[in-house]
Structures are given as structure tokens and as C-alpha cells.
Amino acid sequence: MDTIFAVSSGLLPSGVAVIRLSGPHVINIVKALCGHLPKARLMHYGNLTARDGSFLDSALTVFFPAPHSFTGEDCAEFHLHGSKAVVNRFLDELSTFDGCRSAEAGEFSRRAFMEGKLDLIQAESLADLIEAETESQRRLAVMGTSGRLTTLYRDWRNRLIKARAFIEAELDFSDEADVSDLISDKVWEDVEELCISIRDHIAQGERANILRDGLKIVIAGAPNSGKSSIMNRLAGKSVAIVMEEAGTTRDALEIRLVLGGLPVFLTDTAGLRETENKIEQLGIEIAKQHIVDADLVILVYDMGNPKEVNLPETSAEIWHVGNKLDLYEEENKKTWTIQFSALTGLNFDYFIKELESFCLRRVSEIGNLFPARKRQLQLLKEAIREIEASINYRSLDLSLHAEHLRCASVFLGKITGDIDVEDLLDIIFSEFCIGK
């Protein structure tokens, strides 16, 4: 097997650049560059020298002998000055060693998986942790790397294997009455409890999609109610055209924000009204589709001239908010639970706090343990289908019951990587950056 290397510390130039090395030739390479092998897991400062005797850099080196390393192989890290020239010269020197090459994306983590240092859930969560942009995404990733999900799924899988073993025992000893009683008393009760637990877990996973994929918030309302001004105020910059002429927004405009620690996709839509303009009609149809798909619809009214609009059927929460608070005298305006001026910012802080509270409320509806990725969720759904098939058709031959439970246990094993998932590995580890 080759020894691999990569810059694992990010873009250059930087204060420090960390070069990671893993594989069977690490010890010889470190000795050649440092002049000796540093003590394991202790940072060593000294000069690094090329094999032709030329000076490379003054650096910190740390050696991690197998199996006590990230990959489970011999590993080393070199902490160099973060100059492009220094790093490129050092990488060139590493490439001169036989069997030593630049790592592919995610190759260090893939080796850690192959050596049993990570399971598949932990590997996916590690990639998510590196990509996390919000606090909710960070917590989601940490949950996966902790191993708690793996423990849960392996426990469920072991319960299915045990149930299947009891069923096969009845097949082998069908003339033994005590064995038959054991099946009816133990197996189905436990399988039904397991089925309920997995169903609840799947429901949690459906709700938890917002942590990874974000909430969809749509700004809707009649033309010229100030929707684009709200968009610009929330974005903190001008992203939507604001004009006195009604109907200037013809398409949906989407931006990404972070509210209450959640990623939020905020969409400004065309004003809803009857029109003969074909282009505007198309924009209104697009707006209606966004409303259908939304988690929250902010229905905006001009407080001095509120116009009702027809919304499509949607499961989203709908807020009726009044805009242009600065333009109208108290006696000439309708009162709204949420009212502000997007143009001047009057009372807009309250609106933002309400949005953050909405996001936090959605997070609070999610439990502490749930599938972190759609791949995991899909395999759980496949497993539950097999379990339900076994439970709902008690008249099935016992061998078919056993087969349904076997298939369910295979799906659970694929989540953690305990069952062969070779076809998935290239996809999963390609998501990693070089050097991880």
C-alpha cells in the first residue's frame, strides 16, 4: 500500500501549514527528513532536510505509530511555515520517496474506516462537521461523530438477529412445544416494540432535515406591499429591486441566512394578483409553488392599503404582517400582531426576534438522537418495511418471517458500514477535502 500525503490545514499562505502523512513508509520518511524518529505523540522542533542535503524548513514534527493514529496506520504531521514556496518544496520532496504519493479527497478518512477507526456514520458526520456553517449543523455533526447513533443501530440490528435466531430455532425444533411458546412470548413482542422505536426515530429524522437542509421562508403578498424591502433589510444589503411601480418582481429571488442558529433560505416572490401580463403570470405561478413548499410564509400587507390575496394550499405556518408603519397615522391603519417599516427599520428588530424564535421553536421539536443523513433515513425506511411485513402477516411461513428480519438487519448494517457498502464508499469519501 502507498504512503499518502496532503496539506490538511487549508488555503495558503497561512501562519502554519500542516502536512499529513500516513502509510507503511512513514517511519523511513520521517527519519530521512528529521535525521531521527521523534518520540511518539510528542511534538519535536528541528530542521527538516532534503535527501540531497538542502535545507527545507524549521518545523514541528509529530509521529503517531499504528494503531494509535487517525487512520490506524503509522502517521506523521509536519507543521511548516505557511508559505506556498515552502509547502510546495516540501511536497516535492515527499513525492521523491518510493511508494509515496499525494492523497485523494477523503483518502485519510477512508483508510480510517477500513482500519476500523471510524464507522460509516462517523465518517459521514466528520465530513458534515468540516462543512458545518451553523451551530445547529455543528451539533448535528457532533452527534454523529460521538458514536451514539452507531450504538443505537447496532443494538437494533442485534435484536433483529436474535429474533431471527428464535424463529429459526422453531423451524429446527417445531415439534418442541416450549420452543414454540418462546417464539410467541418473546419474539413478536420485542419486534413490535422495535418497530415503534424505529418509526419514531424516522419521524424525528424527517423533522431534523431542517438542521442540515435549512428552513424555507417565503415572503408573499400583494404587489407593492414592500416584500423586496423586507428582503433587503433581512439580507443587510440590496439584493432585490425596490420601485414604486407594482409588479416589478417577476421571478423568485432566494438568499441564504442564519437565524436562531439554523440555515434559512429566504425567498422574495412576485406580487399575487390577477394580471393579463404573461411574464408576470409565470412569476406568480412560481411564487405559489414556493409557498406550497415553504415552512413559513410571511404574508405582507401595506398597512394603509391592505389587499387580500389568495394563497395556494400549504402546510406552512402563515404570518400576517403589516409593513410601512412609518407612513400612516394611527387612525388610518389596521393593527397587526407584527408591524414594522422595512424601509426605515422601525420595529424591525422585533420582527427579526420573532423569526429567530420561530427557528428555535422548530429546533426544540427535534429529539436528541436522529438520522443525520438522507442515506441513513432511507435505509431505516427500508428496514421498517421489512419488519412491518413480518409483523403484519403472521400467517406467513416462518422461513419468510426470518427472511424479512434478515433483510431488515442488513439495511441497518448498511447504515453503519457493518454490511458491505463498497459501492457507496467512493461517493461518501469523495465529499471530503484533500487532507482529511
From Swiss-Prot:
Domain of life from the UniProt record: Bacteria
Catalytic activity, EC: 3.6.-.-
List of residues binding (6S)-5-formyl-5,6,7,8-tetrahydrofolate: 20, 77, 117, 436
Residues that, per the record, bind Mg(2+): 228, 249
Span of domain TrmE-type G: 214-360
Cofactor(s), by name: K(+)
Xref: CDD domains: trmE, TrmE_N
Keywords: Cytoplasm, GTP-binding, Hydrolase, Magnesium, Metal-binding, Nucleotide-binding, Potassium, tRNA processing
InterPro entries in the cross-refs: G_TrmE (IPR031168), GTP-bd (IPR006073), GTP-bd_TrmE_N (IPR018948), GTPase_MnmE (IPR004520), MnmE_dom2 (IPR027368), MnmE_helical (IPR025867), P-loop_NTPase (IPR027417), Small_GTP-bd (IPR005225)
Cofactor binding annotation: Binds 1 potassium ion per subunit.
Ligand binding (GTP): 224-229, 243-249, 268-271
Function: Exhibits a very high intrinsic GTPase hydrolysis rate. Involved in the addition of a carboxymethylaminomethyl (cmnm) group at the wobble position (U34) of certain tRNAs, forming tRNA-cmnm(5)s(2)U34.
Subunit structure: Homodimer. Heterotetramer of two MnmE and two MnmG subunits.
Name this protein carries in UniProt: tRNA modification GTPase MnmE
UniProt organism field: Bartonella quintana (strain Toulouse)
